Amino acid sequence: MKRFISAWNRTSLIKRIAIGVVIGAILGLLIPKITVIGLLGDMFVGGLKAIAPLLVSALVANALSQTREGQQSNMKTIIVLYLFGTFAAALTAVISHYIFPISLKLGATSATKAAAPQGVGEVFKDLMLKMVDNPINALSQANYIGVLLWAVVFGFAMRTASEHTKELLHTLSEVTSQIVRWIINLAPFGILGLVFDTISKNGVGVLADYGVLILVLVGTMTFVALVINPIIAFVMMGKNPFPLVFRSLKDSRITAFFTRSSAANIPVNLQLCEDLGLNPDTYSVSIPLGSTINMAGAAVTINVLTLAAVTTLGIEVDFATAFILSVVSTISACGASGIAGGSLLLVPVACSLFGISNDLAMQVVGVGFIVGVIQDSCETALNSSTDVLFTAVAEKSRWKKS
């Protein structure tokens, strides 16, 4: 038994999740009536539901509190590029939804009719009311819009606080992230239960739906990396951006793909910036900041999964509402890339815009974890490589103007 536990701990999380997917599928086919196996998935999703509101609050507030006033203009350009690039990726995901609409196989509760908003006006009204909710109530009721708003307010207010106070907030963020890491380490068992429950109820045909979901996610992220980001870079630099784009992808994406954490990839990106001859005073700030707020891949994941849930429930979405969704996903993604699987925990924030219950939203998160072996790796590769790309683009753009 000790040998088994030791070997299990030495195996990467990606491989363990893959093992869980295979075992869950086999058990779902062979013994579909042993429903107690599905309890593993319910417990896993329950743990995520419990920690998700606090995670959003802590990560966003900490990220914003660390930004400093009076940064040189080059740093401001980088931050604008980070936010605009994330928003552009979110809009790309919306467009891909209209071209390749997909639906998900959710549990029995998905039959419950969601309160579909009647156009952008109602969405805006609900958004405003949720934003001013009591922060404690927002945390306890999983009102992610309220959680996000108050996290932003506290984060900006903390910018002028003492370093000791900021350190307390940073510690809270680290502790919350550690709890999430513990839960994520149980993902193989949770995924086993989720796959078992899905296969036992819907059969192997549901795997085709997951295949389409993976193709849409990865295809959209690839389009952002090879089309959207180069367009942004060309506009800023006025010259061929692809040598810089490919250098960023080549040197940053491999480690990011396997660590599935932009935070863990910071040393690699710092070395790459040094190799590119960039200003260390700039990239020493922009790369760590980018690992927290530069979230193109996360925005794609949030929008694709949310709009898939919306399609599944038969909710009509006009482009104006989808535009608001892109704004919300851009803001809510702040802090997601610092931990493995973080963007999936922010899907309920976007789902709440459409009146989708937290229970249904967490089922969508469960689907995200099933495809997460590929999704999270590709997402992090896009996020992390873009940190370097936009840092370099901002600096080269400044040289062009000088």
UniProtKB/Swiss-Prot annotation:
Its lineage opens with: Bacteria, Bacillati, Bacillota, Bacilli, Lactobacillales
Question: What keywords would UniProt list here?
Answer: Amino-acid transport, Cell membrane, Membrane, Symport, Transmembrane, Transmembrane helix, Transport
Q: Explain the purpose of this protein.
A: Involved in the import of serine and threonine into the cell, with the concomitant import of sodium (symport system).
Q: Does the keyword Cell membrane apply?
A: yes
Q: Give the species this sequence originates from.
A: Streptococcus thermophilus (strain CNRZ 1066)
Query: What is the top-level taxon of the source organism?
Result: Bacteria
* UniProt GO MF annotations: neutral L-amino acid:sodium symporter activity
What are its GO biological-process terms?
A: serine transport; threonine transport
Gene Ontology CC terms, in alphabetical order: plasma membrane
Gene name, Swiss-Prot/TrEMBL: sstT
**Per its record, how is this protein called by name?**
Serine/threonine transporter SstT
